[in-house]
């Protein structure tokens, strides 16, 4: 009920990406993990294919979903997982890889298309494309909120593989030194060899990076048009001269709000701030493994 006594209907829901939330990553019969090696795009699409498009159990298949052609974007990498939520895992891989992903509607073929998104570099530091700058000076953002956190920051990890006590295999990732060196122990006991141990260690060390988050309400019809000049996954320049903040950040989250009084956008630039739910999920993943 609104302040003037009128009834209001509030509708909230996920985009088509919510389909991936309905599936876990189930290893093949006789396998402890679903292992994926290749480009980071290939890895993301393998997990999606194995659990939505062509799963072993036909009851898990979602016939409406297809996967776009693999362009093998991203670096060569290796990931393994078991019984983790599909959407959470491919989001983790995508964030580590500086990629994105989406599921869009193909109206001509009545299909939902899963694809990886690379995003465009629209910062002021490049000259190939017209730059996109979000700033109060451009009158295209308001209600801004900036957080820079080093509370959980670590840059050197001692990664523990298989074995116990002095027989346990330990490898280091990260090369910082002196006062700037922040160390952490990383449990990688699932790794089968040194190569996988280091790869897994680098993935987990990324959880301890510096958090730079800029949240703002974006004016959708300002100097830069949403969906035309910029979109989710693009890297843009965010600036607030009063705060002395200038960031080249990826647009990691967009919330579209449709109300009686118009259309609004809320955007997150940079790393999301970990919530208590995120931390609980990480503990739960350790239990599953």
What are the residue ranges of the model-derived segments?
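Short amphipathic beta-strand and strand-loop transition segments with alternating hydrophobic
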Residues: 1-3, 103-105, 252-256
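Short, solvent-exposed secondary-structure boundary/capping segments
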Residues: 1-16, 214, 257-271
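Envelope-exposed proteins and targeting segments
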Residues: 7-9, 110-112, 155, 247, ...
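Charged- and aromatic-enriched interaction segments used to assemble
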Residues: 8, 14-148
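Active-site nucleophile-His-acid catalytic modules used for acyl/amide transfer and hydrolysis
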Residues: 70-75, 207-222
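Membrane-proximal bilayer-interacting regions
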Residues: 252-255, 267-270, 282-286
């Amino acid at each position: 009920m609104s302040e003037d006594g009128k009834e209001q209907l509030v509708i909230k829901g996920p985009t088509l990406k919510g389909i991936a939330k309905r599936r876990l990553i189930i290893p093949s019969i006789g396998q402890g993990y679903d292992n994926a090696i290749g480009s980071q795009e290939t890895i993301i699409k393998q997990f999606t294919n194995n659990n939505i498009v062509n799963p072993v159990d036909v009851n898990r298949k979602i016939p409406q979903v297809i996967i776009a052609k693999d362009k093998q974007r991203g670096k060569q990498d290796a990931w393994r997982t078991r019984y983790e939520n599909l959407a959470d895992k491919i989001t983790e891989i995508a964030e580590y890889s500086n990629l994105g992903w989406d599921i869009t509607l193909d109206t001509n073929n009545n299909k939902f298309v899963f694809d990886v998104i690379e995003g465009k570099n629209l910062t002021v530091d490049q000259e190939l494309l017209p730059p996109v700058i979000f700033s109060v000076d451009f009158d295209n953002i308001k209600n801004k909120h900036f957080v820079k956190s080093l509370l959980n920051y670590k840059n050197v990890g001692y990664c523990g593989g298989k074995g116990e006590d002095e027989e346990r295999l330990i490898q280091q990732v990260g090369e910082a030194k002196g006062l700037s060196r922040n160390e952490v122990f990383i449990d990688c006991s699932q790794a089968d060899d040194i190569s996988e141990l280091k790869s897994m260690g680098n993935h987990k060390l990324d959880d301890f990076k510096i958090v730079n988050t800029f949240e703002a309400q974006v004016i959708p019809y300002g100097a830069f048009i949403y969906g035309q000049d910029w979109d989710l996954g693009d890297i843009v320049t965010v600036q607030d001269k009063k705060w002395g903040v200038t960031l080249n950040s990826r647009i990691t989250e967009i919330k579209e709000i449709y109300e009686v009084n118009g259309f609004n956008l809320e955007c997150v630039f940079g790393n999301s701030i970990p919530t208590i739910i995120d931390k609980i999920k990480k503990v739960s993943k350790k239990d599953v493994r």
